[in-house]
């Protein structure tokens, strides 16, 4: 989207935007429940160096040596591989951590703010992981997959359980089922109550919307996977990106649409493990 349109959108969102403590980026699961062990074997906790290796975002294993996440999770102040670790096979945060080092951090070159799209990044692990029942890559969709409206999909993460209410100990992985919302409907919903002209799109072509009032991702879930079962196979439809608050009426969660970036992903990630 052109800088001018982005500026117009940001100006119109001032009154509706979250307070400083409620960034547009997503961080937690609302309206969901604790995920059964090993149900989502591709789920990743992305950690950043702090007083300890703190959970920053979610992510997904898409190859034994590659993790997919959101670009806003790794920048702009964090760019070096040594700034990050990855945790797989984790049901509860910080319990029996076995953190894996990263060798490459690759944000999409067109990313500069979540509202403008391209909110996607790749992390290469120093070594491939061993695949097991508990650790498996998620399947990426074919370019032709559209994920039609009302498809029931799942989003997972360790984010907030309500607006401004962090996930309490023992920090279990949460899951929630969310319906896909057609992009034009999602865009109309986001314009509702704003002064932004309807000719200025809020939802981008490379976005995918999902969720309704009471069921959504939230702060801390950013970068995590939105998965949909198609013909018996779990496909990653989106990467948790942004939204206005969490689980608000007329404010579905906004995801990066994986099919928009398959060519870019496969510049780096082998299509066969």
Swiss-Prot record:
This is Tryptase-2. Disulfide bonds join 57-73, 153-228, 186-209, 218-246. Gene3D superfamilies: Trypsin-like serine proteases. GO terms for biological process: proteolysis. InterPro entries: Peptidase_S1_PA (IPR009003), Peptidase_S1_PA_chymotrypsin (IPR043504), Peptidase_S1A (IPR001314), Trypsin_dom (IPR001254), TRYPSIN_HIS (IPR018114), TRYPSIN_SER (IPR033116). The active site is at residues 72, 119, 222. Residues 1-18 form the signal peptide. It is an enzyme of class 3 (hydrolase). Keywords: Disulfide bond, Glycoprotein, Hydrolase, Protease, Secreted, Serine protease, Signal, Zymogen. It is found in: Secreted. It holds the Pfam family Trypsin. Its main location: secreted. GO terms for molecular function: serine-type endopeptidase activity. GO terms for cellular component: extracellular region. Homotetramer. Residues 29-270 form the Peptidase S1 domain. It comes from the Eukaryota. Glycans are attached at residue 231. It catalyses: Preferential cleavage: Arg-|-Xaa, Lys-|-Xaa, but with more restricted specificity than trypsin. Residues 19-28 form a propeptide. Its EC number is 3.4.21.59. Tryptase is the major neutral protease present in mast cells and is secreted upon the coupled activation-degranulation response of this cell type. CDD domains: Tryp_SPc.
């Amino acid at each position: 989207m052109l800088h001018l349109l982005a500026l117009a959108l940001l100006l119109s969102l001032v009154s509706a935007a979250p307070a400083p403590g409620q960034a547009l980026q997503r961080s937690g699961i609302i309206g969901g429940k604790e995920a059964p062990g090993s149900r989502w074997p591709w789920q990743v906790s992305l950690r950043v160096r702090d007083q300890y290796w703190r959970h920053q975002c979610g992510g997904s294993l898409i190859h034994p040596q590659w993790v997919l996440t959101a670009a806003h999770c790794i920048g702009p102040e964090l760019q070096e591989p040594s700034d990050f670790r990855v945790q797989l096979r984790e049901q509860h945060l910080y319990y029996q951590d076995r953190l894996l080092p990263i060798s490459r951090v690759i944000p999409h070159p067109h990313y500069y703010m979540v509202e403008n799209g391209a909110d996607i990044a790749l992390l290469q692990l120093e070594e491939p992981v061993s695949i097991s029942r508990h650790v498996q890559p998620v399947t990426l969709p074919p370019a032709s997959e559209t994920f039609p409206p009302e498809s029931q999909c799942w989003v997972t993460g360790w984010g907030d359980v309500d607006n401004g209410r962090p996930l309490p100990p023992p920090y279990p992985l949460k899951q929630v089922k969310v319906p896909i919302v057609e992009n034009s409907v999602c865009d109309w919903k986001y314009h509702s109550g704003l002064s932004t002209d309807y000719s200025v799109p809020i939802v981008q072509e490379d976005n995918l919307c999902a969720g309704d009032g009471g069921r959504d991702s939230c702060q801390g879930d950013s970068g995590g996977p939105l998965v949909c079962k198609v013909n018996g196979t779990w496909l990653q439809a989106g990467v948790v990106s942004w939204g206005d608050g969490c689980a608000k009426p007329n404010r579905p969660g906004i995801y990066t649409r994986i099919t928009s970036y398959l060519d870019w992903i496969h510049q780096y990630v082998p299509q066969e493990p």
